[in-house]
A protein has these predicted regions:
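C-terminal substrate/ligand-recognition segments
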Residues: 1, 43, 140-144
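Structural motif
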Residues: 1-4, 45-51, 89-97
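Multi-bladed beta-propeller domains
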Residues: 6-30, 40-43, 53-70, 99-132
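Residue-level detector of Asp-centered blade-edge/turn motifs that repeat once per structural unit
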Residues: 30-33, 76-77
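Residue position within the beta-strands of beta-propeller blades
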Residues: 35-39, 81-84
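A broad, low-specificity signal marking well-ordered, structured residues that form hydrophobic/aromatic
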Residues: 36, 61, 136
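Serine-hydrolase catalytic core recognition
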Residues: 69-186
């Protein structure tokens, strides 16, 4: 899925984004500055990062970095955003960022503050011996590669046998393998 800019009369349409990725949400449209803020499945289909582009798609900029899931909330004048970040093994971290536009209209971000790091939850997970989840990729009989995750016990010993609980994918529109905390529900 990509972004398109259509005229109100429906007579013209221009593709704004291109590439081998999927846009998962339009976060905001800044009509004054002709920018679109959107979340994209990048750098892998399991991750979500915030990007901004101009209406012609020539200046796309990644505003959040790294693997994991960034859920964002922009302020009304598109100068700040809250980033609700987590990954498969990291509980939610909430940060506030300024959106900075220089004289050449290049866009970057500055971390303003960390609001919450879920420190108590991290301590409890360690105390309870919560195992680390890991991603895996499995080829199917048609040659497609399927994404999955595996949760091993905290004291996993590769020389021992363990019971396996296998959960299958529930169908279209229901992504079960996501790089966010809470995606592992076993």
């Amino acid at each position: 899925r990509h972004l398109y800019l259509n005229s109100l009369d429906g007579k013209s349409s221009a593709q704004v984004t291109k590439g081998n990725f999927e846009i998962t949400n339009i976060e905001a449209v800044d009509e004054t500055n002709k920018r679109i803020f959107y979340t994209m499945a990048y750098p892998t289909p399991m991750d979500r990062n915030l990007f901004v582009t101009d209406f012609n798609g020539k200046k796309a900029t990644q505003l959040t970095k790294g693997n994991g899931t960034h859920r964002v909330q922009l302020n009304d004048d598109y100068t700040k955003f809250y980033d609700f970040y987590s990954d498969l093994n990291t509980p939610q971290i909430v940060t506030v960022h300024d959106i900075v536009v220089d004289k050449k209209k290049n866009i970057s971000t500055n971390l303003v503050k960390t609001v919450n790091e879920s420190a108590k939850l991290k301590e409890k997970l360690t105390e309870y011996g919560y195992g680390k989840a890991e991603f895996m990729r499995v080829p199917n009989s048609k040659g497609d590669t399927l994404n999955g995750w595996m949760l091993k016990p905290a004291n996993f010993d590769a020389t021992k046998k363990y019971p396996v609980l296998f959960c299958n994918y529930g169908g279209p529109g229901s992504q079960q393998v996501a790089n966010r905390f809470g995606a592992v529900s076993a």
